[in-house]
């Protein structure tokens, strides 16, 4: 709710449509088609994936010795971009997507071998929730081809990751930003 309130405070009109990201996408597509809105896709678009890939390039430029990258995993744009860029430079690098243990759409889709719908749930890592779109055109295949594994975290593990980042490094993060540290602290990587 804090994110929605912040968006409204900036003057935007917020419309909550349906019960899932997939429901909202149907409405967004209608608005583009019927009312001339401009859509900026959150993850499943080549330009978005390419932009996210610059993170992988910067990581390897700064630390060419990195053997493994942990990537927050949601709709797959970030994971696809970082993994593809990093693998282009360093083909043997290990790429691990990290998500919450409930409502992890990309993880469930990878396990099923195709995009699937999942129930969206409240989470400390809520920005990792939401569907990937049943007609996913880019991020699913790139994640399938470039992630070595996915790791799922409980709410307690995410909370402990957030706390560790705050108390040890003085970083205030949302849950999704803490999943890499949380996976390490939980011994899942």
Regions found by a protein language model. Name each.
Residues 1-189:
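PLP-dependent amino-acid enzyme catalytic core
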């Amino acid at each position: 709710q804090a994110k929605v309130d912040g968006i409204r405070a900036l003057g935007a009109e917020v419309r909550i449509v349906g019960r899932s990201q997939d429901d909202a996408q149907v409405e967004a597509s209608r608005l583009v088609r019927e009312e001339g809105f401009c859509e900026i896709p959150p993850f499943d678009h080549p330009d978005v994936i390419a932009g996210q890939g610059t993170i992988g390039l910067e990581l390897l430029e700064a630390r060419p010795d990195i053997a493994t990258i942990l990537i927050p995993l949601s709709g797959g744009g970030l994971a696809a971009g970082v993994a593809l860029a990093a693998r282009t430079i360093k083909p043997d690098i290990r790429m691990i997507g990290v998500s919450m243990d409930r409502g992890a759409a990309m993880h469930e889709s990878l396990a099923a071998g195709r995009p699937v719908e999942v129930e969206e749930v409240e989470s400390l890592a809520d920005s990792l929730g939401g569907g990937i779109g049943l007609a996913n055109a880019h991020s699913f295949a790139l994640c399938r081809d470039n992630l070595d594994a996915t790791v799922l975290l409980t709410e307690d593990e995410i909370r402990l990751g957030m706390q560790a980042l705050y108390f040890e490094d003085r970083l205030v993060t949302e849950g999704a930003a803490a999943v890499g540290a949380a996976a390490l602290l939980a011994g899942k990587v």
